[in-house]
Each structure stands twice: as C-alpha cells, then as structure tokens.
C-alpha cells in the first residue's frame, strides 16, 4: 500500500485519541481490516488526495474511521459493498479492479469481534468507513 500512496502523492493523516488504550482483539484480523480499508481508500482516491485514519476510545468501544476524498459511492449502491462478490458497477468504478470481497470480509471480521461497520459516502465527495469494536469482548466463533 505504501508504494501506491507514494506514487499517487496521497496525504495520509493518522490520529489516535487517547494514544494509550488497549483493545482485546485478534491483532492479525484487526490489521487485515485496516489494510483492506486503507487499500480501498488508496484505490479510489485520485492523485494528490487525502486519506485520514482515526482511532478513538468511546466508553467501552474503540471507534475506527477511515476517510478519503476519493470518488465516493452513490447512496443506492452503499448496501451492495458489504455483500460478497457485489461491486458497484458505474462509470465511476468500472476502471478499478477487485473481487468484491474486501468490505464483506471487513464486515465479517468486525462482527467476529462483536462490533459493527457502516459507511457514509456521496459520489464525488469520498467515503468514510466507520467500525466499532468492544474494548474487552471475546471474539465470536464462526
């Protein structure tokens, strides 16, 4: 991902607040969730764009936000992106390759941690994916 960020001259902003709290989570799965979301943000953000990653402690949950100022997703297509093998098929996204598994996988891994994921987006205005994971809840077996 780093090479794509560099080649597209993207600005990446990171913020952790506070910067010293712990989350009981599967580290590999949490890393995969963030990798998938960051990869999508990079893929759908144009040269010179911006990506922001925020992590907040909210009472008993950790809130993660991955925001970009890329192409965005039309309202009628937003539910599709969390369904396996579904992809938004429009002139905006046709040039981008993918399997349609990234966000469904994110959803499944977040839910395994007892959390949930949703997004806010509009065409031409970028996308914000938010997921919340309980700070001290065991993973659900699948």
Regions inferred by a protein language model and the residue ranges of each:
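Short alpha-helical Gxxx[C/S/T] motif in the catalytic ATP-binding
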Residues: 97, 102, 106
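Short helix-loop "hinge" at the ATP-lid/N-box region of the Bergerat-fold HATPase_c
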Residues: 41-42
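Glycine-rich G1-box
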Residues: 3, 71-72
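Short beta-strand/loop element within the Bergerat-fold HATPase_c
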Residues: 48-60
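Conserved glycine-rich
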Residues: 114-115
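Short helix N-cap motif at coil->helix boundaries in the Bergerat
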Residues: 72-80
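Conserved catalytic submotifs in the C-terminal HATPase_c
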Residues: 6, 11-21
């Amino acid at each position: 991902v780093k090479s794509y960020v560099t080649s597209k001259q993207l600005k990446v902003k990171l913020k952790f607040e506070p910067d010293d709290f712990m989350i009981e989570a599967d580290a590999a799965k949490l890393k995969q969730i963030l990798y998938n979301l960051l990869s999508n943000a990079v893929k759908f953000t144009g040269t010179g764009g911006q990506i922001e990653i925020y992590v907040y402690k909210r009472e008993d949950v950790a809130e993660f936000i991955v925001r970009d100022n890329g192409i965005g997703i039309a309202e009628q297509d937003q539910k599709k992106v969390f369904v396996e093998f579904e992809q938004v098929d429009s002139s905006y996204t046709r040039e981008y390759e993918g399997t349609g598994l990234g966000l469904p996988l994110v959803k499944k891994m977040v839910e395994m941690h007892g959390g949930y994921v949703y997004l806010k987006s509009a065409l031409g205005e970028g996308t914000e994916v938010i997921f919340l994971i309980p700070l001290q809840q065991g993973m659900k077996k699948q």
